[in-house]
Regions:
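Beta-propeller folds
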Residues: 1-219
Length: 219
């Protein structure tokens, strides 16, 4: 879809009642800004619904070198408090002054790397789609709250969540070990989605845990 006002539009999602919608927009279609995205919100209950930009590509809280990712599925919380979105590292611009025949590609093997080069190649498409979870609170406009980062990339917000706490699994400390031991291991954290604070609950776990919707109990 496209409109003269919002430019290229993608990833349209509605809330459960279909009273609101969010979508990605690429307002500047020039090559220099091809990786930049804004997020728009539309109140469909209005007499004449119109979309407004709530998450611009340079919003406060976005880490340096990162951008809004249209690979993540936008989702409005059931209570309408926040929007779940994804953030990714922006690709570095290619050096067009170097001819293709002079460019060299190398596989660098390091003993302490999270993934072997062969794993990176096999899972290339999955890694490229991977995003870091962030939240936009409607009562705190002009900023986003990063819940995930490079040290703890796996954060999932359950759709039935009613409280402010989620469980986070962090496998990063055990990725090198996984190269010879297939047993999945991770540290378990409790994460407050209102302020981003994390609390370590348990280390070196081999079984997954679930949290009650209100965030009071974990099993």
């Amino acid at each position: 879809y496209s409109t003269p006002k919002e430019g290229l539009i993608s990833g349209i999602k509605f809330n459960e009642e279909a009273t609101a919608a969010v979508f990605y927009s690429r307002r500047d279609t020039s090559e220099a800004t091809k990786d930049l995205r804004d997020i728009f919100y539309a109140d469909l209950t209005a007499e004449r619904p119109s979309a407004e930009c709530i998450v611009p590509s340079d919003i406060k809280g976005l880490p340096e070198g990162m951008g809004i990712s249209d690979k993540a599925t936008l989702r409005l919380s059931k209570d309408g408090r926040y929007l779940v979105l994804g953030v990714k590292e922006l690709p570095e611009p290619e050096d067009e002054t170097v001819p293709d025949f002079e460019k060299v590609s190398l596989d660098i093997w390091r003993w302490d790397a999270d993934y072997l080069p062969t794993q990176v190649k096999i899972n290339k498409s999955r890694f490229e789609r991977q995003t870091l979870t962030a939240l936009y609170y409607f009562d705190k406009p002009g900023q986003i709250l990063m819940l995930a980062d490079e040290t703890m990339p796996m954060v999932s917000i359950p759709e039935n969540l009613t409280g402010n706490t989620v469980l986070v699994l962090n496998d990063k400390p055990y990725r090198v070990e996984r190269q010879w031991d297939p047993t999945p291991r991770y540290d378990l954290y409790r994460l407050n989605i209102e302020n981003g604070e994390r609390e370590l609950i348990s280390r070196n776990r081999t079984v997954r845990s679930t949290l009650s919707p209100d965030g009071r109990y974990a099993a």
